Amino acid sequence: MGKYEPPYTISNKMLELVSSISEKVGKISSHRELEARPHLRKNNRIRSIHSSLKIEANSLSLAEVRDVINGHLVLGDQKEIQEVKNAYAAYEKISEINPKSMSDLKKIHGIMTYRTVGESGVFRKGEEGVFSGDRCIFVAPPPNMVNELMKDLFSWVKNSEGTIHPLIMSAVFHYEFVFIHPFADGNGRMARLWHMVMLYRWRNVFEYIPLESQIERFQAEYYDAIAQCHVNGNSDVFIEFMLSMIDQALDEVILQVNKTNESMSEYVKRMLEVMEYDVPYTANAIMEALHLKSKDCLLYTSPSPRDA
């Protein structure tokens, strides 16, 4: 039996998007201050987690997700709260994960679904399908095929390293993973996380890119692309969709960085570095974070409405 090759065809649109993304990643990487901003990394990670869970119908708000991650008391559904804790723990492992390891996949799934599903960290033992109301619109491969299909997929990733661009490979993996539906629950969250892990291994700037938030904005199109691929029997539509999402997410980051560099004073840049996204701050809290001695200093360093 020959090596497994996921069906897809490289298009001119894919090549154009890969070129555009590569250029934008280079621009962002040249702004070395991104790497020195742990608050930016954490804020974007919180956004990623909130969006990925929201896609799967978790009802907690961005502020509530942040509070859970920061250890504050949140009144809400306990399963949803546990999902946030699990997702944060899983995302914190990104730099340690080997994206070519099936054992790592199961281990991270065990973290992602801790205390929320019965079959945690193991491939599913039952049939799975996708329903629209009472109508089944997709039937996943039978459970006795899952292990072999996942072995084939990971073998393809290993054998294709260096010959297939990571931007293409990660999108193909994402779709194939969703098609196989290897776990009883958490497949969407794991597919999006593994996509990010593969991108991070290519360029670590993706640690700061909340791609999941872009997907959440275009959630209907995300599922439409997957459904079209099921019908077409290849992942072409999904590859183009995901490359477009990455390209747009990078545009937002570049605009953010350019605006900061062009219009903000050094003190304001410091404020942005220490302040968390979507969190209200008192003057005293900002003074303490910036080591300022008086509110006069704070007023002098604050951005004008034009800069905000």
Model-derived features with residue positions:
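FIC/Doc superfamily catalytic core
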Residues: 1-302, 306
